A protein has these predicted regions:
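Hot-dog-fold acyl-thioester-processing enzymes
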Residues: 1-53, 105-131
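Structured core of small recognition/catalytic domains
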Residues: 40-64, 68, 73
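HotDog/MaoC-like acyl-thioester-processing domains
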Residues: 58-67, 74-131
């Protein structure tokens, strides 16, 4: 539910809070997509992630008190990049509130560099990609 502190004076959700709310849902996506080895690398602090590019399109602004749900998935894979798509549904109004696309990478937190998507991870993600 959208809180008053997330909105402007007119009661509309501020743009940065759409991205914040989508980001809050990412652990759920990774829990579904990651292999045990991926999860262990993240939990140990050896690996993290970063969004390199983000595009947000607000179609019908969420308002204070709106209930929403988020649908997310992988749209494409590069050597190191994962293109993610997000749809934010305004459950109160019954319509699409916003869509977003992001390009993300897994990062080696010791070297601070993006890592290649392993063959095992690529195979798993390709099976789960949005078609």
């Amino acid at each position: 539910i959208i809180g008053a502190d997330e909105c402007d004076a007119a009661g509309m959700l501020l743009p940065h809070n759409y991205i914040g709310r989508i980001s809050d849902g990412m652990p759920n996506l990774w829990a579904f997509l990651n292999s045990d080895a991926d999860s262990e690398a993240r939990q140990s602090g050896a690996q993290g992630g970063a969004a390199l590019e983000y595009r947000l399109h607000v179609h019908a602004p969420l308002r204070r008190g709106s209930m929403f749900c988020q649908l997310s998935g992988i749209r494409a894979l590069g050597n190191k990049t994962q293109n993610m798509a997000h749809v934010v549904i305004d459950e109160t109004a019954g319509r699409c509130a916003a869509t977003a696309e992001a390009v993300g990478v897994a990062m080696d937190l010791t070297t601070r560099k993006a890592v290649l998507i392993s063959a095992e991870r690529r195979q798993r993600l390709e099976q789960l990609m949005i078609r």
